[in-house]
Amino acid sequence: RQYSMETLTGSPATIDEIFKLFKEENAGLIYPDHNDEIPLIAYSWLANEARGRQMFREYDIDAPFPSVFNYPAGSFFWARTEALKPIFDKYYSLDDFEVEAGQTDGTLAHALERILPFICEKQGFEQFILSPMEEQKVKQHKSTLAFKEYFKLDKQALIMELSQYEIISFDIFDTLFTRSVVDPDDVFDLMSEAIYKKYNKKVDFKTLRKKAEAEAVEENEAFTNISHIYGKLSKDKTIGEFATALKDMEIDLEYKLCQPRKDMVEVYSALKSMGKTVILTSDMYLSKPHIAAMLHKCHVSYYDDLILSCEVGARKDDGSIWELIFEHYPKEYFVHVGDNFRSDSQILMDNGVKSFTVLSPKALLELSDFSYLLDYTMDSRFTRSMRVANSLMLGHALN
């Protein structure tokens, strides 16, 4: 709080500079840069993702939904009223907010502070980030200060860090290997294209597939696998008769699209060669044989355990899978490595378990100066075929 207040109101010169940004630079939102007391993972949605997606829809924000981003962490900021007018127009009342009970995440307030920059830019204003200790003291739109130490860490340093532990757990997707598309849902758009070519059926497969998965999860919960999902799709009047063939098509496509994150596979292999116990875990609807084949293709082998949500009926994203894992692997000798800030890091940190966050290829792109390329994979001005093609090209370049 002291850092934030000093950054925003510390001197007359500071306030003059802030008002100059409002007057001359079309500033709508001005807030402090990262402070060392805030963990790196805070610059993501964490437990607020579902609410964040809902707010993107409510406020009609057509920007890509990010995995990492800047926002006024701690809710200290200057703002132009017009820049945040859509929030004022919501007329939130005290009753809309959860009762304060020491929550550190997952409340309306936590979601609101994260949505501010996106509303500001939708309103046609700029966001500025103040970094009083940096050479560049005023940054527009983006800062990577929170990730400075992460970017210093090389492969050998990570191996040394992880080798302190006897049991190393790895997430699979976007950690050890990744799909050669920008977003996992792009696989379903590729399926739409394949269905049209093979069956001459024009369908929005992504919508159908996600609806089927939601219905399957409602019935089968964490045990949901790809057969459950396609069991739901088999009832669709347009593509139901092809459901079995489409299931095989999706499995085959996932296999073809997967490619290793070479540095991370080398980290994995180095730890395995040291005799460490290495387990792999994922929230996934594909079965063990399918995942094992993908791991083999990506040169990941000799793991000690492969734990999948659909096989054990427990998930990382609600913490239940960790309870099962720690029945067999003592947490005091344990570290987990993964890309998801919530399920691979925050949940473990809250339970006193060590974790290490690896940024996904998409997150790295979002932090770069080339994040605008993501627009080419979702802009409605492009046809679906063009967006899919752009996703494939960008996915290959990223990975």
Which residues make up each language-model segment?
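Short catalytic/ligand-binding loop motif for oxyanion handling, primarily in non-cytosolic enzymes
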Residues: R1, Y31, D36-Y43, A73, ...
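ER/Golgi luminal nucleotide-sugar-dependent glycosyltransferases, focusing on the catalytic module
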Residues: R1-Y150
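A metal-dependent, Asp-based hydrolase signature
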Residues: M191-A194, K198-M249
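Substrate-recognition element of Asp-dependent hydrolases with the DxDx(T/V) motif
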Residues: A243-H296, D305-S309
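Conserved Lys-Pro-Asp/Glu-containing loop-to-beta segment of HAD-superfamily phosphomonoesterases
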Residues: D317-D344
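Acidic, divalent-metal-coordinating active-site segment for phosphoryl/phosphodiester hydrolysis
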Residues: D339-S355
